[in-house]
């Protein structure tokens, strides 16, 4: 993923991957691709070097790049979008429920207004809701080989 995206999500996706790898030492590890130079050529080079079973991405063109460079999805490699929305159609991924996040943000703002709080809070709150899996066709269920 582009480095600015990793920073924007406070490295939480990377932390999740590294935590999963640390708690499953018997399974093969893969080096995540986070770069300031995130483009088709660098993604393809990473895929050729790492040979992942599945690619998790938040960057729209990655699936197109994979297919354009000869990977058959999901036959050769699966693809999962980390920020799936209905417009993504057939793609498998995580629906972060942006409408519900927006509603929670409005509730938080209403709370601050009702309590006559202004400015940046001393202790800021973060809104996190559980994502919903969208099955799609690009990431079928498979047994883990290890």
Functional labels for PLM-detected ranges:
Residues 1-146:
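Bacterial carbohydrate/catabolite-sensing allosteric modules
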């Amino acid at each position: 993923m582009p480095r600015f995206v990793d920073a924007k999500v406070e490295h939480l996706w990377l932390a999740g991957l590294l935590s999963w790898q640390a708690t499953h030492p018997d399974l093969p590890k893969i080096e995540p691709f986070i770069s300031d130079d995130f483009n088709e050529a660098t993604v393809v080079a990473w895929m050729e070097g790492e040979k992942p079973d599945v690619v998790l991405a938040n960057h729209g063109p990655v699936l197109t790049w994979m297919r354009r460079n000869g990977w058959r999805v999901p036959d050769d490699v699966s693809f999962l979008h980390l920020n799936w929305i209905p417009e993504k159609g057939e793609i498998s991924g995580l629906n972060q429920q942006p409408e519900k996040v927006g509603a929670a943000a409005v509730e938080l703002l209403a709370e601050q207004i009702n309590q006559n709080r202004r400015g940046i809070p001393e202790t800021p709150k973060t809104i996190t809701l559980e994502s919903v899996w969208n099955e799609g066709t690009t990431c079928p269920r498979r047994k883990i080989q290890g």
